[in-house]
Amino acid sequence: MKLLHLFIAFLIFNFSFLIPLKVLPQQTNKYFKVEVQKDVFIETWFLLYLPDGYDTINQSWPLVLFLHGSGERGNILEMVKKNGPPKLAEFGKSFPFILVSPQCPEDQRWSTDVLDMLLDEMAARYRVDSSRIYVTGLSMGGQGTWDLAIAYPDRFAAIAPICGKVDPGDAAKLKDIPIWVFHGAKDDIVPPEMSENMVNALKAMGSDVKFTLYPDAGHDSWTETYENPEFWEWLLEQHR
């Protein structure tokens, strides 16, 4: 009987390699080039993640634009997978939305105009639900999140800036947008007062902005945020 059990186990182990495994959605490298003036072009590489079922389910999908921090700038697109949603997707997490993760060029900051044109390109090429477009980012990308929403407040259903610099003088442009702000209380790179001052300015204008201040977190206030299912549930519940 023991030999029979061993033989069955041997068959299961070996023939299991013949059973096709479910293929997880993958992030693909994409290239975006736009003419901003006559003979003046802007080029951007980005990671594109399409949700499981995109090719088989004929529907429009939410889109999340993710903006990385300063350490991932350059021309090595794999660096964008270092943190945030691209990192989670790389390790097999399945998202129910289109994820667009561009790379900022070396020694530059996020360009709101280029990002807006990138979103136009995504809406033209893919089945994007225009009422459910979101932006989130960390550190320099948190600042980029604020800046992009300030420049194009009618574009987004919600925004989620994480430890990003921002001028509270721009609060009036954002008071009607659902916002969830995150920061570490021990952040010694971007002081938490940056977020606190903006949150207070928004609340003074009647905004129902949400604010999470992690008491023991330093600059990395994004890992806990992006790994929290409640964050994604809240984000995807928002509609424009």
State each model region's role.
Residues 1-27:
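Bacterial Sec-dependent N-terminal signal peptides
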Residues 18-61, 136-138, 143, 148, ...:
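A domain-start/cap signature at the N-terminus of enzymes
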Residues 52-59, 107-140, 153:
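Gly/Ser-rich "nucleophile elbow"/oxyanion-hole loop immediately N-terminal to the catalytic nucleophile
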Residues 63, 67-118:
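Active-site machinery of serine-nucleophile hydrolases
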Residues 135-137, 162, 182:
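Short beta-strand immediately N-terminal to the catalytic nucleophile in serine-hydrolase-like folds
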Residues 155-165:
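A conserved short beta-strand
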Residues 178-182, 186-240:
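C-terminal catalytic histidine-bearing segment of alpha/beta-hydrolase fold enzymes
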